[in-house]
């Protein structure tokens, strides 16, 4: 998302700049701030903690690009490398990014703002007005019939709902500071303004994410009550016991609702997808033995990695944001490699799960992207750019960037090679047998549900009938 902060005077005084940076500090730390060269010179001290992109026609030699500073004179190149920008509007930058703006944040909006800021105001809709310090702020989102904008606006956050959820997962924002009621009202406003067939996909995605935040907050509040049990316990009236029971019932209701929303969303997607397309992809390596002759460096098993990716895909099936509109998109393995490495670098060479790395990406994860990411991981592993940690077939994938000190080359003896291959074959046979067993249980349960639906809840299958006769 490209957000442009616009002051009614079309310029920022130093005091206003400091107030803005303090007010939106949490969300600005996750984005790239774009300023022109004069603004950078004036606000250099205040902008130091943030990732910056400085526009300069002459590419001033005193500016040394580094991990936190980019110097550019071509805005198109900047957009290729950055998807999330916050632009401090000056006349030069407004002219550059006029057609690329997704969101306007107007300081002290007035009826004359439209005359002072030269853009097509008919393309934007006012989402909310809020206050901070001595200023009013108006949030305007670009209208779109394909992807309705859901910009969450709270006291200390503005941005996409997916960005807020990512910050909550990384614990950069406390779930106790999130006003669920405020987010729900903004969600209802989105439904009221974008009720059409093209927008229903995004609206259901937002519902699932909002439900996850709600369940996370309910779980957190439940833990807080448990810590205060000693103080609130009242033996005579059992006030604490009654309160805990009410909280548990409410928490279960939130969790059940989340599962139901995800189930309904997946069922709706099934009407627009090919039959068993997803299941066929997942079962590819589970129904038959796959022989892999060549191993990755350090004898990492390709089959082991493939099975772990399948398990991750099954868990993320309900949250994959699949666009059903027919579009042509270029997606290369090299591009995905670059995005994965940049996401891993944000964890400072620490070992991190693949699930958290995917949450760091700046766009929704589609099925096509997920499959391409698997190929990109194979290439990165083969080139020894990243390392992989995984205990067994069922454990989660953990990856990290390799440096020269971590690069190791193992040389197996013939006996060790035979033992490793035999162990891999045994693991492979065990996992296939277990998958067949789980599939049989699943088919049996599916048949029982069908018969109960057809003949009523009182229907008893053969197993239950034997139990009844024995009793």
UniProtKB/Swiss-Prot annotation:
One of its GO terms (biological process) is chromosome segregation. Its main location: cytoplasm. InterPro entries: ScpA. It is found in: Cytoplasm. Residues 143-471 are annotated as: ScpA. Keywords: Cell cycle, Cell division, Chromosome partition, Cytoplasm. The keyword Cytoplasm applies. It comes from the Bacteria. GO terms for cellular component: cytoplasm. Participates in chromosomal partition during cell division. May act via the formation of a condensin-like complex containing Smc and ScpB that pull DNA away from mid-cell into both cell halves. This is Segregation and condensation protein A. It comes from Mycoplasma genitalium (strain ATCC 33530 / DSM 19775 / NCTC 10195 / G37). The lineage of its organism: Bacteria, Bacillati, Mycoplasmatota, Mycoplasmoidales, Mycoplasmoidaceae.
């Amino acid at each position: 998302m490209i957000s442009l902060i616009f002051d009614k005077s079309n310029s920022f005084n130093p005091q206003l700049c400091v107030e803005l940076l303090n007010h939106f500090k949490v969300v600005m730390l996750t984005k790239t701030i774009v300023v022109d060269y004069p603004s950078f010179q004036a606000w250099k001290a205040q902008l130091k903690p943030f990732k910056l992109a400085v526009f300069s026609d002459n590419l001033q030699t005193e500016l040394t690009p580094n991990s936190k500073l980019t110097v550019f004179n071509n805005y198109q190149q900047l957009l290729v490398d950055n998807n999330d920008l916050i632009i401090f509007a000056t006349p030069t930058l407004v002219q550059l990014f006029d057609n690329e703006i997704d969101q306007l944040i107007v300081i002290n909006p007035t009826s004359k703002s439209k005359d002072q800021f030269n853009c097509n105001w008919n393309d934007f809709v006012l989402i909310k007005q809020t206050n901070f310090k001595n200023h009013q702020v108006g949030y305007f989102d670009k209208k779109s019939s394909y992807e309705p904008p859901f910009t969450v606006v709270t006291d200390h956050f503005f941005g996409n709902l997916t960005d807020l959820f990512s910050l909550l997962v990384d614990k950069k924002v406390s779930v106790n500071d999130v006003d669920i009621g405020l987010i729900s009202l903004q969600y209802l406003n989105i439904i009221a303004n974008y009720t059409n067939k093209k927008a229903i996909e995004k609206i259901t995605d937002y519902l699932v994410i909002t439900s996850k935040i709600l369940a996370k907050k309910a779980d957190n509040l439940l833990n807080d009550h448990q810590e205060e049990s000693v103080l609130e316990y009242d033996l005579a009236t059992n006030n604490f016991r009654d309160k805990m029971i009410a909280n548990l019932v409410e928490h279960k209701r939130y969790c059940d609702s989340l599962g139901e929303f995800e189930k309904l969303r997946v069922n709706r997607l099934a009407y627009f997808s090919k039959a068993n397309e997803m299941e066929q992809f997942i079962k590819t390596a589970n129904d038959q033995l796959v022989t892999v002759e060549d191993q990755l460096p350090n004898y990492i098993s390709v089959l082991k990695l493939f099975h772990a990716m399948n398990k991750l895909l099954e868990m993320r099936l309900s949250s994959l944001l699949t666009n059903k509109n027919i579009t042509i998109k270029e997606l290369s393995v090299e591009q995905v490699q670059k995005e994965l490495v940049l996401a891993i670098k944000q964890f400072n060479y620490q070992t991190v799960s693949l699930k958290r790395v995917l949450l760091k990406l700046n766009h929704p994860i589609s099925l096509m992207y997920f499959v391409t990411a698997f190929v990109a991981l194979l290439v990165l592993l083969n080139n020894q750019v990243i390392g992989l940690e995984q205990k067994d077939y069922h454990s989660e994938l953990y990856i990290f960037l390799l440096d020269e000190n971590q690069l190791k080359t193992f040389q197996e003896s013939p006996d060790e090679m035979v033992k490793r291959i035999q162990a891999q074959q045994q693991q492979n046979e065990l996992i296939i047998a277990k998958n067949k067993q789980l599939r049989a249980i699943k088919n049996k349960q599916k048949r029982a549900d069908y018969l109960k639906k057809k003949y009523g809840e009182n229907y008893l299958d053969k197993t239950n009938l034997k139990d009844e006769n024995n009793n």
